[in-house]
């Protein structure tokens, strides 16, 4: 990914992982992947993530990429 040193909107990041899906479907898929990975979910919560958040910090993006791979 070209820039993990910036905040990513949740849909913006989701589309990078699932570019052929609609933005809503891409976000639902990314959210499902996150929720299925307990270690990732715990790390994101430790970094301050809540389900109502609209963006991911660079540290959160880094952890997502660690567990899910680079989009």
Question: Where would I find each of the regions flagged by the language model?
Answer:
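A short, Lys/Arg-enriched interface patch at domain edges and termini
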Residues: 54-71
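Major-groove DNA-recognition helix of helix-turn-helix-type DNA-binding domains
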Residues: 20-55
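Ca2+-coordinating acidic residues in Ca2+-binding motifs
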Residues: 12, 29, 60
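Polyanion-binding surface elements
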Residues: 2-21
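Amphipathic alpha-helical interface segments used for dimerization/assembly
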Residues: 17, 30, 34, 64-68
């Amino acid at each position: 990914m070209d820039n993990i040193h910036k905040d990513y909107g949740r849909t913006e990041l989701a589309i990078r992982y699932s570019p052929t899906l609609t933005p809503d479907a891409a976000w639902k898929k990314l959210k499902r992947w996150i929720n299925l990975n307990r270690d990732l979910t715990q790390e994101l919560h430790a970094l301050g993530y809540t389900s109502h958040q609209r963006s991911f910090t660079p540290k959160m993006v880094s952890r997502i990429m660690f567990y899910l791979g680079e989009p």
